[in-house]
């Protein structure tokens, strides 16, 4: 199996030493991701605690906008990545995080606070463990990509279908598979981010830095999606619904 080759003269994280540029790059990725999570949490809390606003969004066809708008933004950013400017990509990321907050507000209205905290902490532990493993492992994870993408497409498709079927059994199956898929994607994405950094940092200085900046945003988007979906799947599996 082919290994990821890092340029000579750079220190590999797998060897216990850290390339300063890579560390700075990943710090930027996690800064975007963290900012996105904070924004989503703030929007979700606001929507869930403003009853008239929650009623307008989730009691009308606007709920479909809340469900599908984030997916549309992700697809647009992915397909237009090369042509979008850094500022446009940043705006899309923050807009996506805000819309995800609107969508996540429904979870605050359905599940107990204790369940939400437990699911969040569980997702955080799994995410951090897999991110660290994906970053430090000597194993080439590139072969996971095709299998994980097939699983991801299946999870998305089944989730959309279940919006109309409302099947408890299908929801359970999707959640179990989803936990596996997003756990794997976390490790795979971390190794991919490291590989992309070394690929782009060796190019023309100006063009390389511009590309790395955009890769930080897209990397944050990928990791954000892994974490949020892992959180939602765990909440669906183990969350306790509010009474009444």
What is the meaning of each model-derived region?
Residues 1-244:
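A hydrophobic alpha-helical transmembrane-helix feature that marks the membrane cores
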